[in-house]
Each structure stands twice: as structure tokens, then as C-alpha cells.
Amino acid sequence: MAKRVTSIGGQALLEGILMVGPKKNVAAFCDEAGNITTEEVSTPSLREKYPILKKPFIRGVFSMVDTLRLGMKALTLSADKVGGEEEEEPSKFEKWLEKKFGDKVMNAVVAVGGVLGVALAVLLFFFLPAVLFNGLMMLTGDGISGWRSVFEGLLRIVIFVLYIVVISKMPEIDRTFRYHGAEHKTIFCYENDLPLTVENVRKQKRFHPRCGSSFMILMLLLGIIIGFFIPFSNPFLRTFCKLLCLPIVVSIGYELIKLCGKYDNVLTRIIAAPGLWFQRLTVKEPTDMMMEAAIAAMKAVIPENGEDIIR
């Protein structure tokens, strides 16, 4: 068990790591020459502006919004840095688009891509499982109707796991998962009150109970429970109701993850177990350079007065 628990968290980036501290957030990037640079990343926080949003069972949704905004900004920054190293001459068509529309066309492409991504996620994780179960009921009869939520929930988990397995075969994603490992190991090293060196970080565990991967699996499992209370079998109505219930799932999942990170007992270990298993897919052993980047980002966000220590 760790000697202390910190509120500092992180996120793996493209050839880098973001560490999120109580006062500031810092990203560390590695270039092809092995040099490490750090850069502060900030976005307006709803929770800092409105303290009531920090209350239990309210903070989960707004914490997720803040995390997504900060994460997207850091990912965009890391993509720009990676793209800058591999910059290619733009085609004539790209030059024409830039001359004609400027940044507007890129903003439009990003917006359309985001909308299509959300639509695909809703289709795969909400609509498709409901349609498939209706088809299964047509073949077997109404006797299995009580298993609807279990079937849909397990199918969502299978789809999500398969998606992670497939993308993990991509070299860029594999490296990102290794940076994820560097993030976890560095946080564990700090929580165990050890000097932040590559040698000490390397010895730490890869799997952390407060990981975002664990949060995703926990939300999928909570979705099964919520599904029992949705009476509709129509795929459109069922999908709509599940989307309405997302804030509830996020809020409960966030509080459970906070408990698992703060306390170590039989109950929290049971809650954390599925997420820790899933991290075997999303958290891999890092290289020394990745650990050095994580250490650089971590040192930059550790406050002097210890206000990050929550236990």
C-alpha cells in the first residue's frame, strides 16, 4: 500500500505526458533526438469558477468536462509537435483550401469529425446492442427479456475491448500506452515517497486504481444496472433514455473511482478489479526516456506545501 495518496493525475499524449496538479498542468514532450521539453497547459475550469460544482455527485460530470477540455488541448499540442517533426509539403489542393478559406476549413473538418465520432459511438454502444437483442428475442421468444440489460452491457464491453485490442496494434497507440505506463509508475513512485528517478520509477506497478481506463470500464458496468430501470425495448427510445442517464452513470462512477484511489480495503479492491484487469490492455511498460518525460512533468506540478496529498 502506498505511503500517501496524491490528487495529481495524468494523461498519455502523442510522444509525451500530461500531469495535472492542484495548481497547474504541465505536459512533457520527447523529440526524436531524445530531448525533453515541458510546457504548461491550461483551460478555464468550471469547478474553479463555481465551487458548488466540487460537491460529491455533482463534481463527476463537470470534472469529466474539464478533463476532456484539458486533454483535447494537450493532445492537439502534442499532435502539432509530432506533426512539426514530420512536416510534409502541402499539396496544391491543400494550399488552395488554405488560401481560399484559411483556418475555417480546418475548424469545419475538426467539427465534422467530432460529430461523426460521437454519432458512431452512440450507434455502436447504445443503438446496436438494443437492435441485436430485439432480433434475438424474435428468434427465442420473450423468455429472455429480463436479460436485456445484461446482454446489451456485455456486448458494449466486448465492443470496447475489441476496439482497444485492434488500435493497440498501431505503433503510435502502442507508444501512447507505454507513456501511460510511465505516468502510472511515476505517480506510484511519488506516492511511495521515493526520489523521482528512472531507477525508482521502473520498479513501480503499472496499474493504478484511479486510471481513466478503469473509469470507462466502471461506467460500462454501471450502465448494466441503469439499463434494468429503462422499460423501453424500442432502440430509439432506449438509446435516448440511456443518453439521458449518462450524467448519473458518470457521477456514480467518479465517486467510486475516488474511493478506490483513496482507500485500500476489500470493497474498494473488488470495485477496482475489473478496471485493473482492463489496464493490461491500455498500460504497457515504458522506456527510460518515457519515464524521464513523466518525471519532468511530475516534478513541475508537485506543490511545495503538499496540498495535493489527500491521505
Please provide the spans of the model-predicted regions.
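Divalent-cation
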Residues: 1-83, 90
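Short, charged cytosolic
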Residues: 29, 63, 67-98, 178-196, ...
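Cytosolic juxtamembrane amphipathic/interface segments immediately preceding
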Residues: 2-3, 7, 12-13, 47-54, ...
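Residue-level signature of transmembrane alpha-helical entry/exit and packing/kink sites
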Residues: 106, 110, 114, 148-156, ...
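Membrane interface segments of multi-pass transport proteins and intramembrane proteases
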Residues: 93-104, 133-151, 230-240, 259-269, ...
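Transmembrane alpha-helical segments and their cytosolic interface motifs
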Residues: 105-123, 204-229
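Polar-ligand-bearing catalytic/cofactor-coordination segments
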Residues: 2-13, 17-19, 146-217, 259-263, ...
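Juxtamembrane "helix exit" motif at the C-terminal ends of alpha-helical transmembrane segments
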Residues: 77, 117-141, 219-241, 246-250, ...
